Amino acid sequence: MPVASLAKVSVSPAAAGDFTVRAPCIYGKRLVSNRVSFGKLRRRSCIGHCVRSELQTSRVLGSVTDLSLDNSVENGHLPKGVSWAVHKFGGTCVGNSERIKDVADVVVKDDSERKLVVVSAMAKVTDMMYDLIHRAQSRDDSYLSALDAVLEKHRATALDLLDGDELASFLSRLHEDVNNLKAMLRAIYIAGHATESFSDFVVGHGELWSAQMLAAVVRKSGLDCTWMDARDVLVVIPTGSNQVDPDFVESEKRLEKWFSQNSTKIIIATGFIASTPQNIPTTLKRDGSDFSAAIMGALFRSHQLTIWTDVDGVYSADPRKVSEAVILKTLSYQEAWEMSYFGANVLHPRTIIPVMKYDIPIVIRNLFNLSAPGTMICRQIEDEDGYKLDAPVKGFATIDNLALVNVEGTGMAGVPGTASDIFSAVKEVGANVIMISQASSEHSVCFAVP
């Protein structure tokens, strides 16, 4: 049954100009909290009524692996700050050769001094790669013909976009990758099983190919451009909940090393994929490219992160359910986080955390309607005295297909550990509880799970 809510999340206002983020963090094997205080900073206005703080006091509770506490990279060879603009293009935006040309045109026309572009795999390619693994695990010989279809999709796209040495170089790399994939899929076929690292390695090839093609198209316009395999830079730590936590300290070190060997003003980076501290390929899971872009934005301290989609911005409600839904011009980080957590098609909730630490605004724009200004997500609006303004309801979000479980009985009242036993059983089956309600009589406990 549908459940609609916009509950408070653990992002709360502190003193004027401050904010507090509460997030789980891992130190050894314990969950801990770290409070990080930034120096007093100067505030300047962004677009419209949004505020961008260059150097504003903030308190952040987050993972010790989420934030570099030193500025050693700031003084190195890699320039950081407002000179960088970060763009992210999803699979729909790079779905075919014409759309890749449109993306390249946006990149070329952006007048930012330096640009980092994060790209997903071409539309449907990630699903095709997962299907390859499924067929190989099932010992279905058709995985070979399915791999040929993936090869042909990218070969045909490259033929439309590239020529000369750029085409020859890409096709050589493409065929080399496909030969490696055949060997890996053959191993999966024989074993009848694919490890998570094997699966992540196979699935991540879509981003590698789209990044290389886009970089080559940008170079055709006469601009210096280099593509980045994010596995060489982005380091994440897998958690037990099928998620990963970015290791900013190690990622900054690797980024500095990468940039010293690839100094350029335009970088086309792969989304979705990363490496573990042991250099094992991994992914940021579904919708991970948005998360990749947010992490990169934080690493480069960019002045803005633009996420390009096929919609004009963030709607006040699902337009398929509410015909009067309108595009929102602005959202605070907290509002966007809450709406996305409760089912709105905005961003993955984790995408907001890295950019919020550095007050980097996120702009949601439509690649296919460049005249639409989109939606800006930034710090909550303040009045002239620095107090956060209370906004009216911005939107509604729903989560469909939930199950409500009610556990009741007269023997539950006053019995210690009943709730612990219930939710331990829920944890054992891997279910995520998103709402809990208990009667004051203690005779029942109700909770919602997907």
Language model features: what each stretch is:
Residues 120, 228, 269-271, 308, ...:
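Generic beta-strand/beta-sheet core signal
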Residues 122-123, 232, 311-313, 362, ...:
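Glycine-rich beta-alpha junction loops
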Residues 289, 332, 365-375:
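Short flexible/disordered coil segments
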Residues 2-9, 25, 41-43, 373-450:
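A conserved regulatory-domain signal marking ACT and ACT-like small-molecule sensing domains
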Residues 164-170, 347-350, 359-371, 407, ...:
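Flexible, glycine/charged-enriched surface loops at secondary-structure junctions
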Residues 2-352:
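Nucleotide/pyrophosphate-binding catalytic subdomain
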